[in-house]
């Protein structure tokens, strides 16, 4: 077999893509919004190169984000993201998120009032989800609550 690459530790979201995500989340508030980030792998980092917003198909969109993974979705490596919009919700993965997200990489954006306050990245390991760093282009960590 080949060499197993080092595990991903960081998601990098350049400013133009970050601005696009923020706008998408704010526009759909108080409903949860989401989509995918098409990425390139650079060593231990996933660098977002495209933002693909996807409609929320949940019957209870203020509480849950549900969508269909189809041809709109970029090929791996990719990061699935969605917002948590209720002030009572948490800034990380809920129990439901942990069970229901079928993707290896997830980004939760905590936006209880529409503006994104926190970005938390996660990778699905063998047994559980592990937290990743989330950075802007400059290597500075994005807000994390």
Model-derived features: where do they sit?
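Conserved beta-strand-loop surface patch within small alpha/beta domains used
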Residues: 1-77, 85-145
